[in-house]
Amino acid sequence: MEIANEKKIAGLVQFLRKGRTMTGRFRLPMLEEQAYEYLLAAYIMEVQLRYRRFIYNGFVEEQLKQVANCLTANTAKFGIVLCGGCGNGKTTMLKALQNLVRRLEILKPNLSPNAGHSSDNYYSFTIVNAMQIVQIRKTDYNKFCKLAEADILGIDDIGTEPAEVQDYGNFIYPIKELLAMLYDAQLFTVFTTNLEPKEIRQQYGDRIADRLNEMMTKVVYRNPTYRTENAQMADSQG
């Protein structure tokens, strides 16, 4: 179905847009293949920092390819969910992403290459644990709100926190609150969880689950844990 007076409507859209800005989608400034190589190197380094031997396998290859695509594709999505069982590399990937963004020193949108070397001109990447978010919400609401202003926010272990928390007689829902704020701000978010997609809906409700579907690309970790006794002796990467 076509819009009547399409040219006129387009002009009205431009008129109404004056003074409004679209939130830029964070992307790595490189092609997908190069992003894969950088991610692989960053991932290997995180494994080595844990005194483990990196083992390249099909699971890791597919996970890295999916994340590289998320970070370079021209899409409306502005986040990644790393979901799957315990100990299979999700937090390792999150930390690898954080280090990569920091090392690349990526300029924020609308800044020229001559903008200077102030840290405020480059994307930062903050990681916080879900349980820490609950505590921050209870003790420092201003700091809690600042989390929703981070250039890129990584939330580790969503689903391990209590669904509701009592604070001075009132029930609060810190993760649901923060996810709603991040959705409104449209800032890039990465989180890890052991929850299945249907469990995310059960824990946080239809409203948040639907918003997460709009915001984020799911990368499902299907490999078993790297934390078994044998893996700890040889190939652990979790």
PLM feature spans:
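A short, basic N-terminal segment
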Residues: 1-76, 229-238
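Walker A (P-loop) ATP-phosphate-binding motif of ABC ATPase nucleotide-binding domains
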Residues: 79
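Hydrophobic anchor at the beta1->P-loop junction of P-loop NTPases
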Residues: 82
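Conserved glycine(s) of the Walker
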Residues: 87-90
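Hydrophobic positions on the alpha1 helix immediately C-terminal to the Walker A/P-loop
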Residues: 93, 97
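Walker A/P-loop NTP-binding motif
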Residues: 99-102
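Conserved nucleotide-sensing/catalytic segment adjacent to the nucleotide-binding pocket
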Residues: 112-183
